[in-house]
Every structure is written in C-alpha cells, then in structure tokens.
C-alpha cells in the first residue's frame, strides 16, 4: 500500500502545533493553532488526543501520531490534489533541490463547525529532504577544480532493502548514461561534517588509497544545481559498493549474524584504518553503519565526516583523533559485535513517520 504522507518533523504543545510532512517530492509546512479550532467538533476531538499525548512521559510515537492522523485524514484529499505523485523513483536530484512547498494553516470558521485550511493557492520552491545548498562562491578554493555533475542528470534508484526510501536522498543514483553511483547530500545541520568528508575524500584520492585495494570509497566529484553565479553544491558522489542480499553494513541482522567472518572484517578494518593513519588521515566516525560489506564479503570503511558516535568513541578527548579511531574499532569489534560487555548502539531517529490512510 502506498504511503499517504511522511511526517519528517513536528512540534506539539497546547498552544501550537507545527508539522513538516512530505508526499512524494512535495513538502508541506502545516500550522494548527489549537485555539482557532477548539470550538469545532473536529477541533475538540483533536485537542483530546493532543492532551493525551502531552500527558505522557516519556512521549509515545503512536500517541504523537493520533491527533495528527485525525487532522491530516480530514485534509487528505487536499494533500493528494496538491501532490498527486507519491513515487520518487526515477526523479532527478534536482527535483528535490527545488521542491514544491506549501505553507498551510488550519483554522476554524468564526461562526460554524467547519475546519478549513488556507495557503493552498501559493506554491513555493525550496530545498526538500533537508538539503542545504552551498553557493559555489562560498566553497573552499581547493574545490574549484573538482569534477561537478549536474543534479538534473542524476536519478533516484531505490532498492528493496531500504527500510524507508524517503528518509533521505542519500543512496544509489544513476547518471543519464546509465552508470550507477552513490549520492551523499549536503544536509541541514551537518554542514561541518560535509566539508570535512569532502576534504578527507580528496586526501584519500590524492594519496592513491581509494578503491578496492584498501577498501575505501572513491570520490567522484561534487553535485551541483543551477548555473554560473547562482550555482550551488548539493552533495557529492562516491563509487557505489554492491552488497550481498544479506544486508549492507554491520548493523544489518543478516551481516551481523555471519560470526565466522567477524575476525576477517576486524582485520580488514584495522588494516584500512592503519593505512589512513600512515597518511595522517583520521576516519572520525567509527560505528556499525560505516563498515560496509561488499558482495565478496569484504569490509569497507566509509564516512569520514567526523560526526562522532559517543557509544564507540569518547567525545571529550578522542573525537576525530587517531586514538579515537583505534578506540572505536576496539569497541566495535571487541565489544559490540562480539557481544562482550554491555555496549549498545543507539540509532539516530529521524523525526518522520509514515502515515497510511
């Protein structure tokens, strides 16, 4: 069954309800002022569910969704008319850089029981999926000579293994020539990590370490949108690593269960990290999702953005250091993967929810 919408972010209080949701490539920013609908039948039902959610500690996701599903269900036909296409496969990356955006507000009529929504007549075009474009004029001088691919020439490819193809634009894409590669978007809130990762990928490439020999990603250039002075950087490309049907990284249950290969993967990761350190390059983000297993069942080290995972590397003094890399590898294989100790991985939860109506 197709998803009616995905909620990516939301703020709920007794005085204000604001949500951001997407349907296909279209995004909606919806404001629901409780005071404006409190005298309507729908508004009263909404407020009962809202107060039930706010009374819970800790907050519950199902309770969080109940008032939103009630209100969004009431306006689902409007959302469907404004965003008739749900499927994103085959769309260009540029479609998400300039995504149709509606800023809507729910309100109750002064005299009557009807709840309406306003703002449907005006469409804005803004970056979607948390893409945070960077002007080429503001990019480091060292990026000037980097190969650049237009976002309009890259198309989304979604695999069956993906739990939620709408969580991020990151993933497999195809060029107009039919070549498969991997797109990493520049996302809001991760600007520093993006800059660091590009610099590390450049250093890996310049040192001749990229590729299968050392199991490190090959930097294939930046992704841009627009032309001339208005051109912006929206991401970069690296080679796409083909994984087995079992999964793609150490956190995948099918991969993690391959106990006989754990030592091999540990040795490979240690060798790769050692090679990086010999060239004064720090991995900076040791965690299960950043060890990719390819179709030959070999372990690759990816993601040098430096967004440190405190479960594996101590934030206070070891983040983005060689010592931190070694600590991370030890905790990853010596504790987490082996099951020794009580180390647990706390996954980052993206604030979105699939709504099937």
List each language-model region with its residue ranges.
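C-lobe/activation-segment region of protein kinase-like
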Residues: 259-264, 278-284, 292-357
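Charged catalytic carboxylate motif
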Residues: 196, 268, 328
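Conserved protein kinase catalytic core
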Residues: 227, 245-246, 291, 309-311
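Eukaryote-biased feature marking scaffold/signaling PDZ-domain proteins and nuclear chromatin regulators
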Residues: 178, 214, 231-233, 281, ...
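Phosphate/pyrophosphate-binding loops and the adjoining catalytic core of nucleotide-dependent enzymes
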Residues: 1-186, 191-192, 200-201, 217
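Conserved hydrophobic alpha-helix
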Residues: 269-276
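Conserved structural core of kinase catalytic domains
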Residues: 185-264
């Amino acid at each position: 069954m197709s998803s009616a919408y995905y909620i990516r972010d939301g703020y709920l209080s007794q005085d204000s309800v604001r949500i951001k949701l997407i349907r296909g490539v279209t995004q909606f920013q919806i404001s629901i002022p409780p005071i404006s609908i409190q005298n309507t039948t729908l508004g009263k039902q909404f407020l009962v569910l809202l107060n039930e959610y706010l009374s819970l500690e800790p907050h519950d996701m199902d309770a969080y969704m109940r008032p939103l599903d009630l209100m969004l269900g009431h306006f689902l036909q409007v959302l469907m008319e404004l965003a008739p296409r749900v499927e994103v496969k085959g769309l260009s990356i540029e479609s998400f850089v300039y995504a149709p955006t509606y800023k809507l507000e729910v309100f109750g009529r002064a005299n009557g029981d009807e709840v309406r929504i306003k703002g449907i007549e005006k469409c804005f075009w803004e970056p979607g999926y948390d893409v945070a474009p960077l002007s080429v004029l503001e990019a480091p001088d060292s990026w000037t000579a980097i190969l650049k691919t237009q976002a309009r020439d890259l198309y989304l490819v979604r695999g069956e293994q993906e739990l939620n193809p709408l969580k991020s634009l990151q993933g497999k894409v195809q060029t107009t020539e039919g070549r498969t590669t991997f797109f990493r978007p520049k996302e809001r809130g991760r600007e520093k990590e993006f800059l660091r990762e590009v610099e590390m990928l450049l250093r890996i490439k310049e040192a001749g370490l990229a590729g299968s020999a050392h199991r490190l990603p090959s930097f294939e250039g930046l992704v841009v949108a627009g032309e001339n002075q208005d051109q912006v950087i929206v991401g970069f490309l690296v080679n796409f690593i083909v994984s087995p049907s079992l999964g793609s990284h150490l956190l995948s249950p099918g991969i993690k269960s391959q106990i006989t290969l754990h030592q091999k993967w540990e040795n490979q990761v240690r060798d790769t990290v050692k090679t990086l350190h010999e060239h004064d390059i720090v991995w900076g983000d040791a965690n299960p999702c950043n060890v990719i297993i390819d179709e030959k069942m070999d372990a690759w080290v990816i993601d040098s953005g430096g967004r440190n995972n405190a479960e594996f590397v101590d934030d206070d003094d070891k983040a983005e250091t060689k010592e931190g890399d070694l600590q991370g590898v030890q905790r990853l294989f010596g504790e987490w993967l082996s099951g020794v100790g009580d180390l647990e991985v706390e996954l980052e939860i993206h604030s979105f929810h699939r709504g099937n109506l």
